[in-house]
Amino acid sequence: MPELPEVEVVRRGLEEHLSDGVIHDVDVRHPRAVRAQPGGAAELVALLDGARIQSIERRGKYMWLVLNNGRALFVHLGMSGQMLIHEASDPALPTTHVRISARVDVGEKDLVLSFVDQRTFGQWQVTPVVADPHGGFTGVPVPVAHIAPDPFEAVFDPAVVARRLRAKKTDVKRAILDQTLVSGIGNIYADEALWAAGVAPSRRTRGMRQRDAVAVLEQAGAVMRRALAQGGTSFDSLYVNVNGASGYFARSLNAYGRAGKPCPRCGEPIVRVQWTNRSSHFCPQCQSS
């Protein structure tokens, strides 16, 4: 699943091309793409037709388009979702795995927004907007209301979140993947943040020093900012920005995906272990447990 930097790259692309655009001619081509919409495809089409895009926002891995009808188009990219933008006259309009398409008029431009999703885990949902319980936004879509602020937000306080983290009875990697504690961090950036902070993923949160917990959270933000500057992390063709280009932060990873290779800090081979239904990558020498 795309993590914060990858979703932010997409959000910025949508903001650049679609801000103040008017949506029409919405075509839902796969029912799973609107499975959370109470009234299905017909309702989503009716709520989007003629709506103007006021802004494009993001919290953690979740993105939404603020509409002028008091609602928001919530976009979940799932494992393989892509939001691709083309001129309506472009002969290279995508045709494979397009689950939803929409025309968007932006000034004199006639654009097509295609939601391409090979694995069909992603979705669109037009939803009411509710007050943000964390105060970062004027309002958030209903599916985002329970999601915690991410490290890029002004309302995110590493010291406060660190205290909550230390109150949990779990391991630190599981804690920072909890989207109700801190959002936006997935498996890749969890491994990278823990490596950067010198903390083993198995370290128990109870008994953790405050400064170590803060360091993990601060490093998560720092790592994701570096990833954002490089367009995110792409291991295959499924993650791309709105123009179809891939990010290249994979070349800068220190732990994730580097099993058996020397730790950039101490030279000890990076270890890969099974962790729940995923993998953890860490240095057994310089990440303390």
UniProtKB/Swiss-Prot annotation:
PANTHER family in the record: FORMAMIDOPYRIMIDINE-DNA GLYCOSYLASE
UniProtKB keywords: DNA damage, DNA repair, DNA-binding, Glycosidase, Hydrolase, Lyase, Metal-binding, Multifunctional enzyme, Zinc, Zinc-finger
Residues forming the catalytic site: P2, E3, K61, R278
Gene behind the chain: mutM
A molecular function (GO) term: damaged DNA binding
UniProt cofactor note: Binds 1 zinc ion per subunit.
Binding residue positions for DNA: H97, R119, K168
Cofactor dependence: Zn(2+)
Native species: Corynebacterium urealyticum (strain ATCC 43042 / DSM 7109)
Name recorded for this polypeptide: Formamidopyrimidine-DNA glycosylase
SMART domains reported for this sequence: Fapy_DNA_glyco (SM00898), H2TH (SM01232)
CDD domains xref list: EcFpg-like_N
